[in-house]
A protein has these predicted regions:
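Charged (often Lys/Glu-rich) extended helix/loop segments that serve as interaction or gating elements
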Residues: 48-192
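Active-site loop/helix belt of alpha/beta enzymes
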Residues: 1-73, 160
């Protein structure tokens, strides 16, 4: 069905880019079916077809470590707790707002204390999402969002001077942590 819709649209094109978001490195991705489909359509139309693997090259890798910098317990017990983190949805992980999507939290239990994680910026929508915690998080607690390697190089911003996270390589066997790149206010200033 997709083929029948696509062919009339691209038959007079030299090339087309079908974009990113193709998780071609996932174990369950039907890569052979995709190759067959793309080759068949390309041969029938003489149109060169491009796809962008995008995040597939780093899928399921990298963590974004942050810290709880403030905490609010609402007076209404039905409302969730709110933890402000040093991770900004708008500056560090904008797909949370744009896609929208909710990144996985390391060691999140199925049930627990419901906590909304928010960012430090002035943006009202700087919200990462609602998560379960075994214990109510405290100021200074660290959290880790999973599958975040694709944000180390693209889509980050210094929105209102929010500092970007450092990029580090961690060796899980030796527990060695090597900082590759750190950012400062000077980096923000130099972009202006």
């Amino acid at each position: 069905e997709v083929r029948n819709t696509l062919i009339p649209l691209i038959k007079n094109m030299k090339w087309i880019n079908l974009g990113g978001g193709h998780h071609i490195t996932r174990k369950d991705y039907q890569i052979n079916e995709l190759k067959y489909f793309l080759n068949k359509v390309s041969n029938e139309t003489n149109c060169q077809i491009y796809i962008e693997p995008g995040e597939a090259v780093v899928l399921d890798s990298g963590i974004l470590v942050g810290e709880i910098i403030d905490f609010f317990k609402p007076s209404n017990e039905l409302s969730p707790n709110i933890a402000v983190t040093d991770i900004s949805a708008t500056s560090h992980i904008p797909d949370v707002i744009e896609a929208p999507y909710r990144p996985a939290l390391l060691n999140e239990p199925d049930k627990g204390h419901k906590v909304i994680l928010g960012g430090p910026s002035c943006l009202a929508g700087d919200v990462i999402g609602e998560y379960n915690f075994s214990d109510i998080p405290k100021i200074g607690d660290r959290i880790a969002l999973l599958d975040q390697a694709h944000y180390t190089m693209v889509k980050t911003s210094f929105f209102n001077g929010v500092k970007l996270p450092s990029i580090a390589i961690w060796d899980s066997e030796t527990d060695n942590l090597e900082i590759i790149k750190s950012f400062s206010f000077k980096d923000f200033e130099n972009k202006l």
